């Protein structure tokens, strides 16, 4: 069993900053706005002597306003139940707030070991402001500044390592290697799309639990949230992301960070599910996202959600329209589903696995050369300045995505339509599905040209 530690506190006390410092990542979204963290965010923290813990970042416990914030608090309470240890964060600059008496009272109901962490101590000269936190009645207290990395080593060495050694003993090292192995082979699947297309609802449907906060309000998900799952003996990591909305004249910093994190998630993932709302017209934003995914070289599966809103005749028209607009994604599977009613959602895994395996496929040089020669025989390259462009041989430059390098003479003069013809021919002949192929052309240099100069 791996120790689980949860970060609890009011909004804007520095929970996400401490999460990023301890996990040595930037997985948690950090901004100077209250209520940015909503869903539970999990991360690994590696300590000395191969000790490893799971850290959970949570939403602030002091907001009880709208439906989204109520769901965020429910997620936080689930995290407290899962955890073995609570790090209760408070803000030294704000001083002791009335809500913190209420939070400490609620924490004690769970009878979990708790460490009070007084954050943002940098620049605080008034000892009275810090001392008033002792009235909360917690035995173990640590003063830190997460943003300046002050007191973090003391927190780890004085409290976390001794607690793990005492409670979990030998099991930690054993689990470290098991989890590292699982993590290596997990297929990372990112759920990408415009706001309110049903990304979080789809993940909840697959997990068969309310793991992600959902609502009819666009922009409910602000951060990229990863969740591990095992399906048909395969390990997957499902990553929910913030919706990539249309360009606006005014956007907040955290909205800008959310979009950046979504694009970074695409780069880090193996396969992308591009979610499209069947009730809305396929717009420029959907096409831009598809184009970005193709250029990032990631496997792509198109998912058209909310098909339950239409009858068979209407759905047939929608299918034809979407297929027409996305014809440049001819190598990808298109699934028509209803995430809300869980129709067609588990068929996605077959396309995800197919896309992942084809992106890592090793293709022999002889197969590529043979395929290239058949393509040339069917349709020869154009003649430039009285000489025909010659394609001599091809080989695999890299995989994930497959990158084919073709060598020849005057290849820089190849037209875009002929390059497209070659890519399409490789797709059909090699039967590659769900992943983009990249082709690079290299001119053979004439060794005598340099000697003449």
Curated annotation (Swiss-Prot):
Keyword Nucleotide-binding among record annotations: yes
- Binding-site list for GTP 1: 9-16, 57-61, 119-122
Q: What's an example Gene Ontology biological process for this entry?
A: ribosome biogenesis
Q: Does the keyword S-adenosyl-L-methionine apply?
A: no
Q: Where does GTP 2 bind?
A: 193-200, 240-244, 305-308
Q: Which HAMAP family match?
A: GTPase_Der (MF_00195)
Q: What is this protein's name?
A: GTPase Der
The species is: Buchnera aphidicola subsp. Acyrthosiphon pisum (strain APS) (Acyrthosiphon pisum symbiotic bacterium)
